[in-house]
Regions:
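Regulatory nucleotide-sensing modules
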Residues: 4-62
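Short, solvent-exposed alpha-helical surface patches in well-structured domains
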Residues: 20-23, 113, 161
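Cyclic-nucleotide recognition modules
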Residues: 69-126
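Intrinsically disordered or compositionally simple regulatory linkers and C-terminal tails
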Residues: 124, 128-139
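Local sequence-structure signature of Cys/Sec-based thiol-disulfide redox active-site neighborhoods
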Residues: 141-172
């Protein structure tokens, strides 16, 4: 279990008042991983994670090949998980421990409470979110494109919705 003093070591929690920090410490799960263990896998329910010890690396499944991204390593003080929480989607990249790690895990409700109650925490999350969404967009554009073929009636709502999604996301 994390103490409020331990949580304050991370910038995201340092801006909280004593009562808020104590509440976060009481509710945060204390996750410990060994090198090689998975923190989260693609497709799982999102959580908000703050790394206190160790190093995590992002791993993505690209065209059926597991690809590591050393440029997306996380170290003590870094947080992750905000993108799928804010977009209300499942996790789309996996994270694996490169070394032994200690991580604070907050659920969706705790995360939204954190950014609702703390202007400073909200600003930090939004700044990092913008950077990460830009990286995601750049990486997506650099990948080989796939062609999608849809079978169905033109006027069916499901087919229309799928075509609209593909078009909006520039998928040929």
């Amino acid at each position: 279990m994390f103490t409020p003093e331990e949580l304050r070591q991370a910038k995201i929690f340092a801006c909280l008042d004593e009562a808020e920090c104590a509440r976060m410490a009481q509710n945060a799960a204390d996750v410990r991983l060994k090198a090689g263990e998975w923190l989260v896998r693609s497709g799982e329910t999102p959580w908000f994670y703050v790394l206190f010890e160790g190093r995590l690396r992002i791993v993505a499944d690209i065209h059926g090949i597991q690809t590591e991204f050393p440029e997306y390593d996380f170290t003590a003080g870094d947080f992750l998980g905000e993108v799928p929480l804010l977009l209300r989607t499942p996790v789309f990249n996996s994270a694996r421990a490169q070394t032994s790690c200690r991580i604070a895990r907050l659920d969706k409700q705790q995360f939204f409470q954190l950014i609702r109650d703390s202007k400073e925490a909200r600003a930090m999350v939004l700044e990092v979110l913008g950077e990460r969404l830009l990286r995601i967009q750049e990486r997506s554009l650099s990948l080989m494109t796939s062609r999608v073929l849809i079978f169905g009636r033109n006027k069916e709502a499901d087919c229309h919705n799928i075509r609209a999604f593909l078009s909006a996301n520039r998928i040929p």
